[in-house]
Every structure is written in C-alpha cells, then in structure tokens.
Amino acid sequence: MADKFDLVVIGAGPGGYEAAIEGVQKGMKVALVENRELGGTCLNRGCIPTKTIIHTAELYHELQSGPSIGLTVREPAVDMEMVQKRKDEVLEQLRKGIASLMKTNKISVYYGTGTILDREHVKVAVASGSSWIGPRRPKIES
C-alpha cells in the first residue's frame, strides 16, 4: 500500500503537528507519523504530566501552611491514585485536542515508526505490517 502526500512529518510533538498544520495551510496534502501518542514527549512524559503533579504538591503544601495565615483546615492527605487519574485526564484532554486539530485540517495520522528511505519515500512500520508513503505527484524519470 502506498499513500501519496506532499509533506510527511515524522513526530507529533509541538513542532511536528504545527509543521503539519502549516503544510495544510500552504495547500499541501500532509501525513503525520507518530510512534507513540500525539503530543510528543512534553505532553505525554515530560512537562505536562510533571507540572500537573507538581501543582497538586503545591496545593498540598499551601494547605499545610494554612494555620500561619489564620486558615484552619483538617490535615490534608494525598490520594496518589486520584493524582494519577487527574494527570491522565489532563493528558487525554490535550491529546484529543491535537487529534481534533489533525482531523479538522485533514491531516492523515499514521501510528508507527517512520523511516526516510529517500527524498520521496517514507516507510511506516506498524505492528500489523508496513505502509509506504510517497509523493502525491508521480515521479517523472527520463
């Protein structure tokens, strides 16, 4: 199977999905290849999950400091299962937002590992096999 595109972007982090959208805005047929989840490292394993958990820790610390500013609260407790659940919900909401952007912009998303074979071909290896992505216009050789 060979699908044809004007632009193939490998990696669906912020740089990747923004490049894909820009390609569409310039009139290109675009494919986006990602081997994990939309959003890249920052969204899924880095900045966003870390900051979501840190926010909970900061609130916990503020609640513990309540008496020093005249605020009386019962001893706060951390429910790590709930903290993880909230983090997962935040990430899922953001991933859905990116997926919606891809759909709205008619960007074809391929989940797998993209390998550039040459200037005009990208191989996408997925669990069920491979897909070939090439140029939309046929190559003319003399």
Each predicted region: which residue ranges?
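Glycine-rich flavin
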Residues: 2-5, 21-28, 33-142
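Short alpha-helical segment within the catalytic ATP-binding CA
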Residues: 18
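Beta1/beta-strand and adjacent pyrophosphate-binding region of the FAD-binding site
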Residues: 2-15
